[in-house]
Regions:
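N-proximal low-complexity "stem/linker" segments adjacent to membrane-targeting elements
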Residues: 1-47, 51
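C-terminal catalytic/acceptor-binding lobe
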Residues: 2-5, 163-234
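Anion (oxyanion) recognition and catalysis
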Residues: 32-35, 91, 194
Length: 234
């Protein structure tokens, strides 16, 4: 009987010089307790996110021989349990690229920010091709999507190989356009993935926390019934 090779993983993130302690706690916990064979971490420091990601993916592909790369944002709160939801869904052939779910808001630093999942479908807009969020988000569902944030994304090495073959010389990450036509580096990457005909899968049960600032004011207090709303949580 031929012994099957154990697949390996590296983890990558970008930061501006500092990371949240909850992020690092989650990474260490996952490295130690997930039971997966890790082959190192990759970090890019700076403020040009597209350039940082491009540097990381090339460094990983050229120098790190792990089968899979886990992309994390440096303010994500990962756990071994949530990571394993993605890891156990992976398949180098059929599911080479998959994302979990974290939440952002179009109203940063407001007292009652509406949380929205960073999972998208491509859509035609008046100003051209754009994206729309998957909202409401279906619970405990494994489905194909068009794009996502890069904050909790698992990628097989073959994804980069296939992009190189289908679109030689094209950067993996770039920021293009301006104003309403601006496309961030993460959506650009998934547009490239889509053009290379690589599917992106999403497990909506693999949700992780996202450390963000918000204004904890009276509106927030009122949302919990002037303090009474916590009674049902105890």
């Amino acid at each position: 009987m031929v012994k099957q090779k154990k697949e390996t993983l590296a983890v990558a993130w970008c930061d501006n010089g500092m990371v949240d302690g909850k992020f690092m706690e989650g990474v260490v916990d996952t490295l130690i307790n997930s039971g997966v064979e890790f082959c190192g971490s990759l970090r890019a420091h700076g403020n040009q996110i597209a350039q940082q990601r491009e540097t990381l993916v090339n460094r990983w592909y050229d120098n790190n021989k792990s089968d899979w790369l886990l992309w994390l944002d440096s303010d994500i709160m990962i756990t071994p349990e949530k990571f394993l939801k993605l890891w156990n869904r992976r398949d180098a052939v059929d599911v080479p690229l998959l994302t979990g779910v974290y939440f952002t808001s179009d109203q940063p630093e407001q007292p009652l920010m509406r949380p929205l999942a960073t999972v998208y479908e491509f859509a035609e807009l008046p100003e051209g091709i754009g994206i729309r969020r998957l909202d409401p988000l279906p619970k405990n569902t494994f489905l194909k999507v068009s794009a996502a944030g890069m904050g909790f994304c698992l990628m097989h090495r073959s994804v980069i190989t296939r992009i190189k073959e289908a679109l030689p010389g094209v950067p993996f990450f770039a920021e293009v356009g301006a104003n309403k036509q601006f496309t961030g580096e993460d959506i650009y990457f998934f547009a490239v993935v889509n053009k290379a005909e690589i599917p992106l899968w999403c497990d909506t049960a693999a949700t992780v926390g996202h450390m963000k600032r918000f204004n904890m004011g009276e509106d927030y207090y009122d949302a919990f019934g002037r303090g009474k709303g916590y009674a049902g949580l105890s």
